[in-house]
Amino acid sequence: MEPLLLIYNPTAGKGQLPDELAAVLDEFTKANWLVTAYPTQGKGDAVRAARELGPRFSRLVCAGGDGTLSETVTGLMQLEDPPILGYIPF
């Protein structure tokens, strides 16, 4: 199993993401990923999570709106060797 970091905004998509989270985690697990899920708590949180946690993972997926994606990319741009990024829009 390879490590994957999932940074997600629990309020994205009118709060629908938490309802879909189990299905998302199930699909990653079936694909042999060991998932660590990180729910953002406010502005700038995805930047910090991507920057501080990103180096520990070979893949990082963010789930949320354009703000979550923007913050995640901002955090990854601060890394010398960032993980591969995936995006699930909500």
Model-assigned labels for residue ranges:
Residues 2-90:
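Small-residue-rich beta-alpha loop regions that form the catalytic core of phosphotransfer
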